[in-house]
Amino acid sequence: MYNIYSDNLIEADWFKSLNKKFSDSKVALIKSRGNNLPIIEKIISYDRPDIILLKNNKPLLVVEKTREVPTGHNVGQRMARLVRSVELNIPTIFFFSI
């Protein structure tokens, strides 16, 4: 069973629509710190990524997505989200416009 955690239900629905395997996935919003599964707490300890995909409560993927061109402050504010998942050896994808 896949679980999709997100800061935003629109993002979660977008991700869920990417693959038929996710059609029965449970979607949950990332809660405030201290109110999530322990693995979610580890992943969000620096900042909250757009998508966290779990299978049997084990992290499979972290996704960060932006429509803005990666210049200025936008890239920097997203780095903590990406760095933490990489530190935890979780595959990580960053989608952005070019």
Regions found by a protein language model. Give the residues of each.
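Well-ordered, non-membrane alpha-helical segments in soluble/globular domains
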Residues: 73-81
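Short acidic, S/G/P-rich loop/turn micro-motifs used as interaction or catalytic elements
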Residues: 9-11, 66-72
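Nucleic-acid nuclease catalytic cores
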Residues: 86-98
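A short, Lys/Arg-enriched amphipathic alpha-helix followed by its capping loop at the start of a domain
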Residues: 13-26
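Active-site metal-binding core of divalent-cation-utilizing nuclease and nuclease-like domains
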Residues: 5-6, 26-56
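A short, highly charged nucleic-acid-interacting micro-segment common to nuclease
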Residues: 1-16
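Conserved catalytic cores of phosphodiester-cleaving nucleases, focusing on short active-site segments
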Residues: 51-53, 60-67, 82
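A general structural motif
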Residues: 1, 58-59, 89-91
